[in-house]
């Protein structure tokens, strides 16, 4: 095949040069690209539309260019398809080339010009703005071609002037057009300085009388902005392509596997996986033979199955190595064999036999199969942590860097390693800033909102029914039994060996209790965990899940996103990439690590608006709010002085049914001030803050006033002596049946309440609606004479309390449905994970024991942190004063003492703080409503009691006086702090062993006995001694488990015991 030096395009064989129509396929021509450029001619770039008009109208554009001189014929070369580039004839040296070319040019000029004119392809028509045919690319005055030398100085000079707004200039460049003129030949050497343009033809951008350069600059700007994300583009077609991201439309579909894409380039890249594959074989490979139950030997593969290739490539087949059967007949779960590197044209695709992912190279397949085998070949040299990918190891090594730069947020103090993450984080603080509020995309079905349209589309797919369920057969074929699910052969997580020792048997029995209590539909989607192929009704096939694109190759669970599948695979591989820098504990998810940080910071940013209780997690606050949202019936609401539950007439009458649909059917709370209705008590309490200016709710018994109805409710319960006093005599329309007394709480609740509301209030009041409990709680709480103070006992677990308010608060624990019970102590839990965590408390041994005090820990990181208490090790030291700390968090807090910096500023009152936690705590003060205002100074308070205490400063009243000197104080805390000065100084008792100081001689004697090997803490039941209170508390739990019924006791056989 010969290339056309004139650049006409055709080169034979269906392939062309760069200047042709199709372009050279460089994957099929592995010759030197620079050598190819020296002997090819390129057509000048043509400008169309607005750009051509703007360039042609430049004031420095002269008339038509001069005619080029005749061109000498260059030598012809062969370009074999699969060989390196070699010239057809040897190129002479520079000394001989000039003489030979000059002597032969006169003899062959006529013939070469005629032949080249016959072989040259006619030039395409130019736009009217140019008005002349394009000139040749190179100048004939340039020297003859030099082998393998390419100079870019002329190219840089040409495009450098275009960027500066001036004309295209250079050797042989026609002014105003930007195309060089001359015969073909290489560019000048770097030592040769190309001559510049004439002074008359120079363009001055400052003398832009007609606005040509402004017009050209306008055309180069991005004038097509996106109305959703404000991103701009130069061309309208790019904007149209970008809008597919927001609309979620995927118009480009693969004809082999049916996957859709929003960009044509993504579809082109995807089609490489289906190279040389017929459409019938483009789908996922067929699942392998049926898997036997876990623990049983796998059947030997047939000859046909073993010979079938696992890839769909037309090249050398990449057959995975089948697991060889062992001596006892069981198949060894060996790793999946990796095909050898393909030589020649076999560049894939290679399919994974477990998850059906397709890869182009066998090395990529081998790297992917590490996920299934659980192998981690890359380990850290500092902490010995291992990873399955080299990129993960590089990312982890950066965490050990001492001088790692962290950029703190000026608002909340959170630090980031990347400036881009910090900018995104600060944009979240800005909210509705300069860019306006963020767009919200709500769901029309459930009302849930999302910040991105793609998330809304994925959410709507969950509402849509599966296609298989929508198109059910009408001929009764659906009732036919479904075949058991099949899975591809490969390494799976097999169960451990049968237990041999007593401890292993006990652990296996505990696991059987946990998984035996889990409902079958929960584990039906994981047939491999059940030890068999699974049932068709419970779990279905793991090979394909309706509506799920990405399926797990180990358990068959389907997911809608690839990222979710990757996070799920960590459950099988055991990878925990997120580590706490304080205690070393690891987590699979990053949000688990964020929740864990609250343990070290002890920050409780979530506060209940009604009772003021604070929590560290939003889930805890949500569960706590259910206490305030409990809907009270008419009987208890009238006793507590609360707004009664409004419902249909006769809802609390004798005709009310005991099987109501639920607590929210026809029930609502009404505001007594404005009459607005709310679904539960929590919302009406929040609404009451609008009407509150003082404390309008007073107690009839003691006259104490409250600003919240909920606080009045809890206060009135304190005045009740027994639970039966909460239930007043039944009204005329509510007579107890069977002639029982009106104070029988169980009868009143059975007939006057409906459904779950009555059951919940009955549990709160300590009674039960059934016949098994009767009035046991009432008798145990208030009835019966006892020698000590009156205590209130729980009828469910037998725990007793000194105050009735404590019993009411405790009753909420039993309102949560707990279906999983511990076989050792009988304690019940709502989830299997909570039960697994509880099982740890019954283990006799822990893996890591302290050699000094004998304390055991679950993890090595906890033991290492504990041993610092014995060695007085302080690994984190201050560089200013040299003080050591046990935690790095303590050192960061201590550094503020030396710097005095207060980097965290409140945006409301401009008050500054040294710690981010202090600023977060201060901001919550601005968020809380403060309706109580001082008339003297204008200071506001949340409660009226705080306002009255503050007004003493203006009145000069000192209500608190010291008993010793009679000095008066405004606040109680001030007088308590003052009275410490009158107390005699106590001698300091310091331990000679650990230098710990004590003020109480009793504690000091017990501490010395612990150093001497004594056990001063004795159990009152069995007399066993312990060195510390921690061991004694753990020992008492064992006695409590024995008293509750032992291992065979269930959740309903708990014996009563005082708290």
From Swiss-Prot:
Pfam families: zf-C2H2 (PF00096), zf-C2H2_6 (PF13912). Residues 61-78, 124-137, 183-198, 281-296, 481-499 have a biased composition (Pro residues). Residues 1-24, 58-142, 161-206, 275-342, 461-503, 726-747 are annotated as: Disordered. A zinc finger (C2H2-type) spans 224-246, 252-274, 350-372, 378-400, 407-429, 441-463, 550-572, 578-600, 606-628, 669-691, 697-719, 792-814, 820-842, 848-870, 876-898, 904-926, 932-954, 960-982, 989-1011, 1017-1039. One of its GO terms (molecular function) is RNA polymerase II cis-regulatory region sequence-specific DNA binding. The keyword Protease does not apply. The keyword Metal-binding applies. May be involved in transcriptional regulation. This is Zinc finger protein 865. It comes from Homo sapiens (Human).
